């Protein structure tokens, strides 16, 4: 599986609680925070849920 570099590019203020919880579960708490995860189906599902807040790159 490919490694994914995930960056939070929009604020979590005013978002649905579920979307904030998803971002926090990915390890994203501040704007421009970046994490790396494996491209598992679980991670891809989380990314799809909040894709409007993120920038995702394959490494």
Swiss-Prot record:
GO cellular component, one term: cytosolic large ribosomal subunit
GO MF term (any one): structural constituent of ribosome
Top-level taxon of the source organism: Bacteria
Keyword terms: Ribonucleoprotein, Ribosomal protein
Pfam families according to UniProt: Ribosomal_L30 (PF00327)
GO biological process, one term: translation
Disulfide bonds: none
Classification via InterPro entries: Ribo_uL30_ferredoxin-like_sf, Ribosomal_uL30_bac-type, Ribosomal_uL30_ferredoxin-like
Keyword Amino-acid biosynthesis listed: no
Known partners and oligomeric status: Part of the 50S ribosomal subunit.
Family: Belongs to the universal ribosomal protein uL30 family.
Descriptive protein name: Large ribosomal subunit protein uL30
Source species: Clostridium botulinum (strain Eklund 17B / Type B)
Taxonomic lineage of the native organism: Bacteria, Bacillati, Bacillota, Clostridia, Eubacteriales
